[in-house]
C-alpha cells in the first residue's frame, strides 16, 4: 500500500501515471481506478501523460467494472437486473401485496416515486455492505415491518427466478472471499485517483485485494500544511486529509508528499492559499494584482441568458484571437444543469459552438413514451377521444399523412364521441356534406384494427403478451414510422433516436426476464412498460473530440482545461446542500450505523456537506490552467438571487467583481463571432428602437447592411425590413376588385361591424378570409340560442284560442321533435340534461310574455335589409347595404308604435360608451333598418335575457322578498322613446337614462350610420390594422384577442398599437351617472358628427 498527496497546482494524474508505468515495468497489470463521473476524462489524461501515449498493461476503469477483467470461476449463472428490471420486480411484488398488509406504504404501494426510493435504498444498502435484516434495528415499528416485508418478498422473488442480487462489486467481493478468482493477484496492481472517500463496498474490495498481496497506490490532493496539522476540522482539505489519515492508520503506511516546487505562485495557487488560511484561521499576506484579477475573473450578470451569451462571445473572441486554440480547451461548469439546459442549446447553436453536455436524458418526454402512455390511457379509461387524438399526434402510430390525421381529429371532435363501441360504428353524420365520410371510415378502420386486436388480449403469459405487442407494433406501423423519422434527421439526432429505441427494447427485455412464466394482464403490462420507460435514460457521446464540454460544477477536478467558465454560482447553488429524500431519516441512518458491525456504514449526507463543499470549491478555483471565470446572475429562474458566499470571500481577498451586460445599443468587434450570432446581434440592435449617434457606429451599420444585402442578393434572397411589431399590409387593387366588385352590392352586418371595432384584423380573418370555428355536433351556446328562439317563435305564432302556457308547452313539444334539435339533444345523457335546463329557462322567460297585455307580437325572426334600400351612401357614391334578422317585433296596442326585441342568453344592456366606440350598435341598427323600410312610429328597442334568475337567499329577509328581487331582473333592457314610455308596463326597465326624445333618437341613428360609414370605407380600401381595443389602457380582454397565434400581438409588448377607447373628458374627476351620463355622451356624439 502506497499513499501519495500533492499540492493542488501539480497534476495528481501525471504523478500516478508515472507510478503506474513503474508498476508495469515491474511486470504488473495495472488497473487505474477513477470515480464514475471522471473515468472517461481520466482515461484521456492518462493516455496523454503516458510516455508512449498507450499501454496494453494499464486499464483505466471503475471499481464496478473490475470484475470484467478478472477471471471468476464456478459462479452460478444468474441474470443480472439493472434499475429498470429491479423497478419492475418491486412493482410486481408490491402488486401482489394487500394494501392492508402495509401499514405505512399501503396507499401508495405502486406509486413510481416510492418504487424509485425503494430501488435507491436497495442500492445504498448493497454499497454499505448492510443486510436487509439489519432493518430490524429501526425504531419505527410500522416502517420496520413494511420495509422488511417488501425486501423479503423481493429477495425471495429474485432467488426463485435465479436473478442476481446486489451490484457487480458485491459479486466481486463474494468471489474474492470464496477464492473464486483464478487471476494471479501477485501480477495485479491498483492505482486509485480522484477519491476523497470510499463507500463501504469499495473499501471492502481494497481491503480484500490488499490482503491478497495486490500492490495498491492511492493519491489525493492536500497541502503539506493541512496534512501535518493536528486539527483538520473546517479545513479546505478536510475531506482528502481525513481520507488519507484513515488509510494511513488502517494500513500503517504514512502518506508521501509529492508536491512540486513551482518557480512562481500563479493566481489560482494564490487564491487557494488565501482561502485555506481563512478556513484554518492562520495569517497570510499575499497581494492580488491586476494579472491575478485578469486570470481569475468574477462576473455579475443580470440573467442566465445573458451569462450564456457572454460566455459564448468570450469563447468566440478567444478562438478569433488565437488560432492555436480549439473548442476542447474550454470547459463550462453549471451551477444548476436543469436551469441552463434549454438556453444553452439555443445560444450555443446561435454562436455555432459545438458542445457536449455529459448528462443522461430522461425518456419521459420522448414521443415513444407518450405513445405507450396514450395506449395505456385508451385501455384504462375505455377509449376516450382525447387519448386517441394524443396517440395519433405522436406521429408514431399508423402511416397516415398529417392531413388524414387532421381530418380524422376534426371529425371525431365534431361528433364528440367516446368509448370503443362508438368508434366501431360506421360514421354517417355530416354537416351539409362538409366531411368525406367514405375516406373517414377507411381511416377509422385503419386506426382501430390494430388496437381492437391488442385490446382483445386477456390475462396471459408474459411471453405471449410480448408476441402480441410485437405484432401490434408492426400492424400499427410503429417501427416503420420510427425508421422514416430517423432517415430525415441529422447524424446526431439519428444516434439519439437509436439510443431511445435501444432503451425501449431494453425495458421489454427486462420485463421478459422479470415476468417470465407469469400471468400478466394487458393493462398491467402497459403500466409496467410506461413505468419502465419513464425511469429509463439514454446518453449519446459527442461526434467529435473537439467540443466544449459542459458539466455540473461539483463534478470538476483540478487542472481540467485551459479556460473554465463556471456560471450560475448563486447562493442557492454554491455550495450545494444535499437533502435526504430517502425512506430513511438521518437519525435512522445514524442508529443503524451504530448498531451494525464495523465496516457497515450508510452515508449520512448532512454530515458530509461541509467538507465536501469546501473541497469542491477548492477544485473549482483550481480547475483552470490559464483563465477562470466565475459568474452569478442577479435573476435566477425569474427570482432574485445573491452571489455565493465563496465569491464574496474571493472579492474580499482583492479579486474584483465585474458588472457584465449585453449591449444591444451598439455593435462592436465582439459581435463578429459567427454569422448567426452577428445576424442575431443586428436584429437585437434594430429592436432597441434607438440608434447610436456616433458617426462611427452609423457607418458600421450601413456598411454591414450593404455587405449582408449583397450576399443575400447573390443567393437570390430578399433583404426584408426587420419588424418591431406585428403589422398588416393593405390589400392590392386586384384583390379588392375580386373581393368587392364595383357593380356588386357591399353588405355589412351588425355583428361584422362589432367585430371590426373589436379588432380590424379579426374582421379580415372572419369575414374576408372566412376563418371558421371548429364544428361541433354537441350542443353549444349557438344551438341553445336557436332552440330557445324556435320555441318562442312557434309559441307566438300559434292561435290565441289556447292559454299562453298551453301554447308554450305545445311549442316546446313540437320544437323538441324537429330533426335538427332531436339529433343534438338526444345524443347523450349530458345533452338531455342540458335540454331540461333550457326548457326551464323557456318556461321562466315565458312569464314576461304571458303577463304583458300592452303589446302584441307581429313578427318573429323578421329579416331586414336587401338590394331595394341602401343603408348608407359613401362619399364616392357607393352604397352600403346592411342585412340581418330581428328576433321579434312588437306593437303597442294603444297607438301602434313598433318595438324590436333581441333575445340574449345573459344580461345585456345598452351602454353609451360602447356604442360611441362602435361596440354596441345592434339596437340602433335594427331601428334604422325598420325606419328605412317605412316604419316611423317606434316605442323602443330592447334585449330580453333568456335565463333563470338567480337570487341569493342571504340577501333577502323572506322567500317573498326573493321572488320580488328575482322579478326585478326579468325585464326588457334597452332604449325607449320618452313619449311612449307611459304605455309600457312593469316589465320594461324605462329609467331616465334609457329614455330618448325624438331628437336624441335621431342623433343615435345618425351616429350609428357614421360608424358604418367609417368601417365600410376602411374595409373597401383594404386596410385592416392589428388593433384590438383596450378598455383600461393596460390589458386586452381575452374575447377581444382571440387570434393572437395568427397576429402575434402581445399586450405587454405591443399595447401602443392597440385602440384605446374614447372616454368622457370630465373636469375635476367627477363621476357621472344616470341622465347626466347619457347627456354627456350625447353631447360628445354631436361634437363628433359636427367635425
Swiss-Prot record:
Q: Name one Pfam family in it.
A: PDDEXK_1
Gene3D superfamilies in UniProt? P-loop containing nucleotide triphosphate hydrolases
Q: Looking at the keywords, is Hydrolase present?
A: yes
Coiled coil (residue ranges): none
Cofactor(s) it depends on: Mg(2+)
Listed under GO biological process in this entry are: double-strand break repair via homologous recombination
What EC number(s) does its UniProt record assign? Answer: 3.1.-.-
What Gene Ontology molecular function terms does this protein carry? 5'-3' exonuclease activity; ATP binding; double-stranded DNA binding; helicase activity; hydrolase activity, acting on acid anhydrides
Provide the alphabetized UniProt keywords: ATP-binding, DNA damage, DNA repair, DNA-binding, Exonuclease, Helicase, Hydrolase, Nuclease, Nucleotide-binding
The record makes one more remark, namely:
Despite having helicase-like domains, this subunit does not have helicase activity.
Task: Describe the task this protein carries out.
Answer: The heterodimer acts as both an ATP-dependent DNA helicase and an ATP-dependent, dual-direction single-stranded exonuclease. Recognizes the chi site generating a DNA molecule suitable for the initiation of homologous recombination. This subunit has 5' -> 3' nuclease activity but not helicase activity.
Family as reported in the entry's similarity comment: Belongs to the helicase family. AddB/RexB type 2 subfamily.
HAMAP family attached to this UniProt entry:
AddB_type2
Oligomer status and interactors: Heterodimer of AddA and RexB.
What is the name of the protein in this document? ATP-dependent helicase/deoxyribonuclease subunit B
The root-end lineage is: Bacteria, Bacillati, Bacillota, Bacilli, Lactobacillales
Amino acid at each position: 500500500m502506497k499513499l501519495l498527496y500533492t499540492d493542488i497546482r501539480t497534476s495528481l494524474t501525471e504523478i500516478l501515471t508515472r507510478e503506474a508505468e513503474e508498476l508495469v515495468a515491474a511486470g504488473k497489470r495495472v488497473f487505474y481506478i477513477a470515480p464514475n463521473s471522471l473515468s472517461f476524462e481520466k482515461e484521456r489524461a492518462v493516455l496523454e501523460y503516458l510516455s508512449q501515449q498507450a499501454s496494453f498493461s494499464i486499464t483505466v476503469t471503475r471499481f464496478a467494472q473490475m470484475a470484467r477483467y478478472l477471471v471468476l470461476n464456478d459462479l452460478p449463472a444468474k441474470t443480472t437486473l439493472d434499475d429498470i428490471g429491479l423497478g419492475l420486480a418491486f412493482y410486481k411484488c408490491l402488486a401482489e401485496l394487500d394494501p392492508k398488509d402495509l401499514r405505512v406504504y399501503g396507499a401508495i404501494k405502486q406509486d413510481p416515486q416510492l418504487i424509485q426510493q425503494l430501488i435507491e435504498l436497495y442500492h445504498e444498502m448493497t454499497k454499505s455492505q448492510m443486510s436487509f435484516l439489519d432493518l430490524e434495528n429501526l425504531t419505527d415499528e410500522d416502517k420496520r415491518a413494511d420495509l422488511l416485508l417488501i425486501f423479503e418478498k423481493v429477495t425471495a422473488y429474485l432467488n426463485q427466478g435465479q436473478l442476481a442480487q446486489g451490484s457487480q462489486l458485491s459479486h466481486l467481493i463474494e468471489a474474492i472471499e470464496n477464492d473464486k478468482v483464478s487471476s494471479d493477484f501477485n501480477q495485479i496492481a491498483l492505482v486509485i485517483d480522484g477519491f476523497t472517500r470510499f463507500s463501504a463496498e469499495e473499501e471492502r474490495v481494497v481491503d480484500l485485494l490488499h490482503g491478497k498481496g495486490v500492490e495498491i497506490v492511492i493519491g489525493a490532493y492536500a497541502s503539506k500544511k493541512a496534512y501535518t496539522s493536528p486539527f483538520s476540522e473546517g479545513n479546505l482539505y478536510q475531506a482528502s486529509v481525513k481520507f488519507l489519515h484513515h488509510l494511513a492508520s488502517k494500513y500503517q503506511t504514512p502518506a508521501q508528499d509529492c508536491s512540486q516546487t513551482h518557480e512562481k505562485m500563479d493566481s489560482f495557487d494564490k487564491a487557494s492559499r488565501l482561502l485555506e488560511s481563512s478556513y484554518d484561521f492562520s495569517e497570510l499576506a499575499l497581494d492580488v494584482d491586476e494579472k491575478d484579477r485578469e486570470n481569475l475573473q468574477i462576473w455579475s450578470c443580470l440573467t442566465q441568458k445573458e451569462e450564456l451569451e457572454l460566455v459564448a462571445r468570450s469563447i468566440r473572441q478567444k478562438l478569433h484571437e488565437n488560432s492555436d486554440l480549439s473548442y476542447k480547451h474550454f470547459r463550462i461548469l453549471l451551477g444548476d444543469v436543469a436551469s441552463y439546459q434549454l438556453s444553452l442549446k439555443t445560444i450555443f447553436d446561435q454562436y455555432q459552438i459545438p458542445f457536449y453536455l455529459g448528462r443522461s436524458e430522461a425518456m419521459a418526454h420522448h414521443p415513444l413514451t407518450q405513445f405507450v402512455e396514450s395506449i395505456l390511457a385508451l385501455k384504462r379509461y375505455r377509449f376516450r377521444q382525447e387519448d386517441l387524438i394524443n396517440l395519433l399526434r405522436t406521429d408514431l402510430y399508423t402511416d397516415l399523412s398529417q392531413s388524414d390525421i387532421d381530418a380524422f381529429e376534426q371529425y371525431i371532435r365534431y361528433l364528440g364521441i367516446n368509448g370503443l363501441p362508438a368508434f366501431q360504428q360506421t360514421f354517417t353524420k355530416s354537416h351539409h356534406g362538409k366531411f368525406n365520410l367514405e375516406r373517414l371510415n377507411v381511416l377509422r378502420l385503419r386506426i382501430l384494427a390494430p388496437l381492437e386486436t391488442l385490446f382483445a388480449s386477456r390475462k396471459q403469459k408474459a411471453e405471449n403478451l410480448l408476441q402480441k405487442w410485437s405484432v401490434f407494433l408492426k400492424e400499427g406501423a410503429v417501427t416503420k414510422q420510427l425508421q422514416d423519422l430517423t432517415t430525415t434527421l441529422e447524424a446526431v439526432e439519428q444516434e439519439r433516436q437509436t439510443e431511445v429505441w435501444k432503451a425501449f427494447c431494453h425495458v421489454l427485455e427486462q420485463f421478459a426476464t422479470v415476468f417470465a412464466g407469469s400471468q400478466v394482464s394487458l393493462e398491467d403490462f402497459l403500466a409496467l412498460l410506461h413505468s419502465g420507460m419513464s425511469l429509463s435514460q439514454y446518453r449519446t457521446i459527442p461526434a467529435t473530440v473537439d467540443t466544449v464540454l459542459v458539466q455540473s460544477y461539483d463534478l470538476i477536478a483540478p487542472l481540467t482545461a485551459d479556460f473554465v467558465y463556471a456560471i450560475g454560482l448563486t447562493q442557492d447553488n454554491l455550495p450545494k446542500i444535499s437533502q435526504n429524500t430517502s425512506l430513511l431519516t438521518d437519525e435512522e441512518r445514524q442508529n443503524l450505523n451504530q448498531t451494525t458491525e464495523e465496516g457497515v456504514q450508510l452515508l449520512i449526507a448532512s454530515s458530509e456537506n461541509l467538507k465536501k463543499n469546501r473541497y469542491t470549491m477548492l477544485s473549482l478555483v483550481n480547475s483552470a490552467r490559464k483563465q477562470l471565470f466565475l459568474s452569478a446572475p442577479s435573476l435566477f429562474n425569474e427570482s432574485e438571487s445573491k452571489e455565493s458566499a465563496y465569491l464574496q470571500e474571493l472579492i474580499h481577498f482583492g479579486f474584483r467583481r465585474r458588472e457584465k451586460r449585453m449591449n444591444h445599443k451598439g455593435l462592436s468587434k465582439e459581435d463578429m463571432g459567427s454569422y448567426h450570432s452577428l445576424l442575431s446581434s443586428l436584429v437585437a440592435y434594430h429592436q432597441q428602437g434607438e440608434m447610436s449617434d456616433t458617426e462611427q457606429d452609423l457607418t458600421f451599420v450601413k456598411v454591414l447592411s450593404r455587405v449582408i444585402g449583397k450576399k443575400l442578393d447573390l443567393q437570390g434572397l430578399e433583404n426584408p425590413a426587420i419588424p418591431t411589431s406585428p403589422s398588416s399590409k393593405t390589400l392590392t387593387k386586384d384583390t379588392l376588385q375580386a373581393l368587392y366588385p364595383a357593380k356588386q352590392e357591399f353588405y355589412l352586418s351588425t355583428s361584422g361591424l362589432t367585430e371590426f371595432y373589436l379588432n380590424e384584423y379579426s374582421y379580415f380573418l372572419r369575414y374576408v378570409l372566412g376563418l371558421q370555428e371548429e364544428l361541433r355536433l354537441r350542443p353549444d351556446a349557438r344551438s341553445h340560442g336557436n332552440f330557445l328562439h324556435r320555441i318562442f317563435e312557434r309559441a307566438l305564432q300559434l292561435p290565441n284560442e289556447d292559454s299562453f302556457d298551453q301554447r308554450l308547452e305545445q311549442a316546446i313539444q313540437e320544437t323538441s321533435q324537429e330533426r335538427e334539435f332531436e339529433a343534438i339533444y338526444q345524443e347523450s345523457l349530458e345533452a338531455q340534461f342540458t335540454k331540461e335546463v333550457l326548457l326551464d329557462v323557456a318556461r321562466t322567460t315565458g312569464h314576461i310574455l304571458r303577463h304583458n297585455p300592452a303589446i302584441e307580437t307581429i313578427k318573429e325572426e323578421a329579416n331586414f335589409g336587401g338590394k331595394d334600400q341602401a343603408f348608407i351612401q359613401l362619399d364616392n357614391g357607393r352604397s352600403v347595404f346592411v342585412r340581418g334578422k330581428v328576433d321579434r317585433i312588437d306593437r303597442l296596442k294603444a297607438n301602434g308604435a313598433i318595438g324590436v326585441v333581441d333575445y340574449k342568453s345573459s344580461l345585456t344592456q345598452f351602454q353609451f360608451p360602447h356604442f360611441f366606440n362602435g361596440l354596441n350598435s345592434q339596437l340602433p341598427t335594427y331601428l334604422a333598418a325598420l325606419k328605412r323600410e317605412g316604419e316611423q312610429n317606434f316605442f323602443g328597442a330592447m334585449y330580453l335575457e333568456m335565463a333563470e334568475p338567480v337570487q341569493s337567499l342571504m340577501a333577502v329577509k323572506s322567500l317573498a322578498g326573493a321572488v320580488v328581487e328575482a322579478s326585478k331582473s326579468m325585464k326588457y333592457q334597452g332604449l325607449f322613446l320618452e313619449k311612449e314610455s307611459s304605455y309600457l308596463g312593469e316589465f320594461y326597465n324605462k329609467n331616465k337614462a334609457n329614455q330618448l326624445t325624438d331628437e336624441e333618437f335621431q342623433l343615435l341613428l345618425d351616429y350609428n350610420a357614421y360608424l358604418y360609414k367609417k368601417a365600410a370605407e376602411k374595409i373597401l380600401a383594404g386596410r385592416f390594422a392589428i388593433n384590438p381595443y383596450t378598455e383600461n389602457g393596460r390589458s386586452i380582454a381575452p374575447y377581444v384577442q382571440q387570434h393572437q397565434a395568427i397576429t402575434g400581438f402581445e399586450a405587454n409588448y405591443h399595447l401602443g398599437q392597440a385602440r384605446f377607447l374614447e372616454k368622457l373628458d370630465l373636469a375635476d374627476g367627477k363621476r357621472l351617472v344616470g341622465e347626466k351620463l347619457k347627456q354627456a355622451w350625447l353631447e360628445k356624439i354631436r361634437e363628433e358628427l359636427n367635425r
